[in-house]
């Protein structure tokens, strides 16, 4: 699934980076592929997005006017025409493979052509501060449910049901795991290192959250305290509530971290407290951009104005991300089990020209 021509150059580049560069914390590169088949025999829509950490850097949409891979980050725009040609061909091949897989999966599950169906894939790699592989993954889902996943050993598969076992047997016979493992341990890590170097001003920054607590009366006896964290990057953050110094785990409303639309993120955590006891509750915030964790209380005399415009913008971006990529929310969960892997044969799987950061095109289901 990868073009070998530039591999020697990339190996030299990644080796140099490994010797000269270290990165704070771990980093990840992930691709999300989604194929949606409409009812009947219409052509499936295929959408692909790529992320380094929490930053989208590439997108492809088979329904777009310009069906090419599109840069979504300044640091990837510097890649030349050959890079974008390879990216585009990768996505087009994957779209063709997923079209076949959707047809086969309908047969495996004995489904008619009346309904709409979705086939998803998420794959990628994580590296540590030393730039070495920490973890690789390749997970597939059908209609929002786990289908098959590469195990943590990168040598074997876990099938979610009897239909997925059909795919598992095909992939084991094709020795597909071995080739995917070679990609995850090799080119995936190499290109992630390259992106981290090229985009270090963006990808390795740490923007601390802007925080405050708001008070919302419910009745004469209760009120909601909401702890806000806005404008932070990267997305990983921890918000907790304590009562008299003891962490509260029950009845906490915690929203998922949301994109703000400007490259940063938003999050809040809320809980209902007895009126008059608000000062017994503290919100605790931990984030990479903070020198030390923050502790906040509601200050009755200085209720801040909630930045509704920014929050609405964040929700709008979230909606676009969800509907445009239809990807992460229902991706399969990882499983682990033992087993033997192998190397993918051309006869069983699409074997693309290899290059840049493109993964092996997934075998047909």
UniProtKB/Swiss-Prot annotation:
Key words of the record: Disulfide bond, Glycoprotein, Immunity, Membrane, MHC I, Phosphoprotein, Signal, Transmembrane, Transmembrane helix
Main location: membrane
Subcellular location(s) of the protein: Membrane
Signal peptide: 1-24
Glycosylation sites: 110
Parts of the chain on the Extracellular side: 25-308
Chain residue ranges for the region called Alpha-1: 25-114
A Pfam family recorded for this sequence: C1-set
CC annotations in GO: early endosome membrane; ER to Golgi transport vesicle membrane; external side of plasma membrane; extracellular space; lumenal side of endoplasmic reticulum membrane; MHC class I protein complex; phagocytic vesicle membrane; recycling endosome membrane
Segments of this protein annotated with the region Alpha-3: 207-298
GO terms, biological process: antigen processing and presentation of endogenous peptide antigen via MHC class I via ER pathway, TAP-independent; antigen processing and presentation of endogenous peptide antigen via MHC class Ib; immune response; positive regulation of T cell mediated cytotoxicity
Residues recorded with modification Phosphoserine: 356, 359
Spans traversing the lipid bilayer: 309-332
Disulfide bonds: 125-188, 227-283
Region spans: Connecting peptide: 299-308
Cytoplasmic side: 333-365
Any one GO MF annotation of this record: signaling receptor binding
Superkingdom in the source lineage: Eukaryota
Membrane topology: Single-pass type I membrane protein
Segments of this protein annotated with the region Alpha-2: 115-206
Domain Ig-like C1-type intervals: 209-297
Family, per entry: Belongs to the MHC class I family.
Function: Involved in the presentation of foreign antigens to the immune system.
Subunit architecture: Heterodimer of an alpha chain and a beta chain (beta-2-microglobulin).
UniProt-recorded name of the protein: Class I histocompatibility antigen, Gogo-C*0101/C*0102 alpha chain
Organism: Gorilla gorilla gorilla
Lineage of origin: Eukaryota, Metazoa, Chordata, Craniata, Vertebrata
């Amino acid at each position: 699934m990868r073009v070998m021509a530039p591999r020697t150059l990339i190996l030299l580049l990644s080796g140099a980076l490994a010797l000269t560069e270290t990165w704070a914390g771990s980093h990840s590169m992930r691709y999300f592929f989604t194929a949606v088949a409409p009812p009947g025999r219409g052509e499936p829509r295929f959408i692909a997005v790529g992320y380094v950490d929490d930053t989208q850097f590439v997108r492809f949409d088979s329904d777009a006017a310009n069906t090419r891979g599109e840069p979504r980050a300044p640091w990837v725009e510097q890649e030349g025409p050959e890079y974008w040609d390879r990216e585009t061909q990768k996505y087009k091949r994957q779209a063709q493979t997923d079209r076949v897989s959707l047809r086969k999966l309908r047969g495996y599950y004995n489904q008619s052509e009346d309904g709409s169906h979705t086939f998803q894939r998420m794959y990628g790699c994580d590296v540590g501060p030393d730039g070495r592989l920490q973890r690789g993954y390749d997970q597939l889902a059908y209609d929002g449910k786990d289908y098959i996943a590469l195990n943590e050993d990168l040598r074997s598969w876990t099938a979610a049901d009897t239909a997925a076992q059909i795919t598992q047997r095909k992939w084991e016979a094709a020795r597909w795991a071995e080739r995917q493992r070679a990609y995850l341990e090799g080119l995936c890590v190499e290109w992630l290192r390259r992106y981290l170097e090229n985009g270090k001003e963006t990808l390795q920054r740490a923007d601390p959250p802007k925080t405050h607590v708001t008070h919302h009366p419910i009745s004469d006896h209760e009120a909601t305290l909401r702890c806000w964290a806005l404008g932070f990057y990267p997305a990983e953050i921890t918000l907790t509530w304590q009562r008299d110094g003891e962490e509260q785990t029950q009845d906490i409303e915690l929203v998922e971290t949301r994109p703000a639309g400007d490259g940063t993120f938003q999050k809040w955590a809320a809980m209902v407290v007895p009126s008059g006891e608000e000062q017994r509750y503290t919100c605790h915030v931990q984030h990479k951009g903070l020198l030390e964790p923050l502790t906040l209380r509601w200050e009755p005399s200085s209720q801040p104005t909630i930045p509704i415009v920014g929050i609405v913008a964040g929700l709008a971006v979230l909606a676009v991300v969800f509907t445009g990529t239809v990807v992460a929310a229902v991706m399969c969960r990882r499983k682990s089990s033992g087993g033997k892997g192998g190397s993918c044969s051309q006869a069983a799987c699409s074997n693309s020209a290899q290059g840049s950061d493109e993964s092996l095109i997934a075998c047909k289901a």
